[in-house]
A protein has these predicted regions:
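Alpha-helical substrate-recognition element adjacent to the catalytic core
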Residues: 1-134, 225, 229-232
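C-terminal cap/substrate-recognition subdomain and adjoining C-terminal extension
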Residues: 78-101, 105-375
Length: 375
């Protein structure tokens, strides 16, 4: 998952042609937008969309095509053009399907106009967008993405509920039902506006990378994100083959590949355990748990407590009887109290209930006899 402005592109997309074309200085445009947001109690992203729309009046036709055309002029960081296909190929060679998503407060229409989007680089672009009238002219915000609601899109990606209007994103999904677990996610961003997403990905076991402009070498923001525990890695925003970022992401894909193998293995073992449990009652599971507890008893007091619980249950399985006999032979915390009345009574009944004596039962009989003589 990627932010866009200053993550894939060196500057805000609006500042790379659009703002200038409507006769504004870039800094003055953002100042006007922020003042509107502050004075009106308006979301900052809604404010810039409003100012864009208003300032276009009488100067240009504010259509999707116009915005996409401005998007086609947006400069991208080195290597971005072939990054997405290259990383997809690397993942495929390691058994990992790579999907690229944009989660940006910028304009979807402008992002769609970039070379990367036109080459179908992205699975989905989640960004602010306009609603257009029957003439194709923008009249109202259709969707606004800000730094706090960005996180909903991570949940949509995780659950495979990609439609922004699908309420199933709020449904409970079991871990093995998640389409893309967060442990398999990589989030790349550049600033505090990415922090909620970075935090969410990291908390889910995934990776968050902070990037900075290699031209300016200004690492102030990534240092802060590292200091605040928002990222574990940072690198120059150079997406070229062989770059630091390229190596870092490939190393993460390698780890995801291994993790997927381990998760598949764990899943198979879990299914085996569940098949074993099918048809077994709560009493069956309770009995086995107590037998294991007796095998691992660390004190005489624990032994007496476990035996009291076992006496309440019926022990009919030959395998379970052998496990109990083995516990008395191998665990001193059991063997040394065989002469105690409750333990003696339990093991005597256990042996008497066996149709065919075993080596273990004969050994326990001898120990019981010895303990009786000592008493």
């Amino acid at each position: 998952c990627y932010d866009f402005d200053k993550t894939l592109s060196p500057d805000d997309m609006q500042a790379q042609g659009y703002i200038q074309s409507v006769g504004w200085d870039v800094d003055e445009f953002w100042k006007k937008s922020n003042e509107l947001a502050s004075s009106s109690g308006m979301d900052q992203n809604l404010a810039y969309m409003y100012v864009m729309l208003r300032e276009a009046e009488g100067k240009l036709l504010f259509t999707r095509e116009t915005l996409m055309n401005y998007g086609s002029r947006v400069q991208l960081f080195p290597g971005v053009d072939d990054w997405f296909e290259r990383i997809r190929g690397y993942g495929a060679s390691h058994g990992v399907k790579i999907e690229h998503y944009i989660i940006s407060s910028g304009l979807k229409e402008m992002i769609e106009g970039t070379r990367a989007a036109r080459s179908n680089a992205f699975e989905r672009i989640y960004a602010s967008t306009f609603h257009y009238n029957e003439k194709g002219v923008a009249v109202w915000p259709a969707q606004v993405v800000n730094y706090t609601n960005k996180t909903q899109f991570l949940f949509r990606i995780e659950k495979g509920v990609l439609d922004i209007n699908d309420p199933a994103v709020n449904d409970v999904f079991l871990p093995d039902e998640l389409r893309i677990p967060r442990r398999n996610m990589i989030y790349i961003g550049d600033s505090d506006t990415d922090v909620p997403c970075m935090k969410l990905v990291r908390e889910g076991g995934g990776y968050s990378i902070g990037v900075y402009n290699a031209q300016t070498q200004d690492k102030t923001k990534v240092y802060k994100m590292m200091r605040d525990g928002r990222i574990d890695y940072f690198a120059p925003a150079d997406y070229s083959a062989g770059s630091e970022l390229d190596a870092l992401v490939k190393a993460m894909i390698d780890r995801v590949s291994v993790g997927n193998v381990l998760e598949a293995w764990r899943g198979e073992l879990r299914q085996e355990q569940q098949r074993f449990d099918i048809g077994r009652s709560e009493a069956d599971r309770r009995r086995v748990d107590l037998i294991i507890a007796l095998e691992n008893s660390h004190s005489f007091a624990d032994t007496h407590s476990i035996v009291r619980e076992l006496q309440k249950l019926e022990i009919s399985s030959p395998q379970e009887r052998e496990m109990l006999l083995g516990a008395a032979l191998k665990n001193n915390q059991v063997r040394l109290v065989l002469g105690d009345a409750d333990v003696r009574r339990f093991y005597t009944g256990l042996i008497e209930g066996m149709k065919n004596p075993s080596e273990s039962s004969q050994a326990i009989e001898q120990l019981l006899a010895q303990s009786g003589e000592e008493q």
